[in-house]
Amino acid sequence: MTILFLTMVISYFGCMKAAPMKEANVRGQGSLAYPGVRTHGTLESVNGPKAGSRGLTSLADTFEHVIEELLDEDQKVRPNEENNKDADLYTSRVMLSSQVPLEPPLLFLLEEYKNYLDAANMSMRVRRHSDPARRGELSVCDSISEWVTAADKKTAVDMSGGTVTVLEKVPVSKGQLKQYFYETKCNPMGYTKEGCRGIDKRHWNSQCRTTQSYVRALTMDSKKRIGWRFIRIDTSCVCTLTIKRGR
């Protein structure tokens, strides 16, 4: 699935003359994650401000189309949920790179950029009103996200329930690249470590719990067989509730 994801991204973004995200010096030179998304200036600097505004609209439509295509392909390759109830989500949280990635995975950036375009089309007053921080919106559970290496993970659980060794480096034509995993988990130092935010403690027991999903990674099993397998990694922090008894 990772190869399919990269192929689709390259096909859509390889012909673009400008990348919409950030400056070129932000990304690592050895990254293989987004080979088609490179910044060589802004749309305004190439064709003027009017061309830039037209380009932003076109990019927004392209991003939406890419996301729809990715979701369609994800539904095709996802295994039978009746036989794999634990395989509830497949994500593109794996990157092969010579150095630590400086940005979240591409789909995270697409969502962030789409939100930016939506905000750019609002008036200043509406924009302030739509800001979650100004509306007092808070997450039920505090979470943290970061890139980790196979050296941090060591081992993982595959789809058959077996424990496999996560290989730190992946051989490529010009040498070796490290495997990086973008993990999201509950923040042990956050304000929700004693329970979920906004829950009535008189009637409910609550707990913020880290949940996992499957990603594809290069691993080695107990019989020393090396191959690409789906393994569990931390991908979200959710609130679990149990009702208090005896009241």
From Swiss-Prot:
Chief location of this protein within or outside the cell: secreted
Kindly list every residue the record annotates as glycosylated: N121
State which residues form the propeptide: 19-128
Leader sequence range is 1-18
Q: What is one term from the GO cellular component aspect held by the record? A: axon
Listed SMART domains: NGF (SM00140)
| Gene Ontology MF term list | growth factor activity; nerve growth factor receptor binding
On modification after translation, the UniProt record reads: Mature BDNF is produced by proteolytic removal of the propeptide, catalyzed by a FURIN family member. In addition, the precursor form is proteolytically cleaved within the propeptide, but this is not an obligatory intermediate for the production of mature BDNF. Can be converted into mature BDNF by plasmin (PLG).
Report keywords, A-Z. Cleavage on pair of basic residues, Disulfide bond, Glycoprotein, Growth factor, Secreted, Signal
From its record, what is one biological process in GO terms?
A: nerve growth factor signaling pathway
In this chain's numbering, which residues are marked as the site (Cleavage)? T57, S58
The UniProt entry's sequence similarity note says: Belongs to the NGF-beta family.
Quaternary structure? Monomers and homodimers. Binds to NTRK2/TRKB. Can form heterodimers with other neurotrophin family members, such as NTF3 and NTF4 (in vitro), but the physiological relevance of this is not clear. BDNF precursor form: interacts with the heterodimer formed by NGFR and SORCS2. Mature BDNF has much lower affinity for the heterodimer formed by NGFR and SORCS2.
Name of the protein in its database record = Neurotrophic factor BDNF precursor form
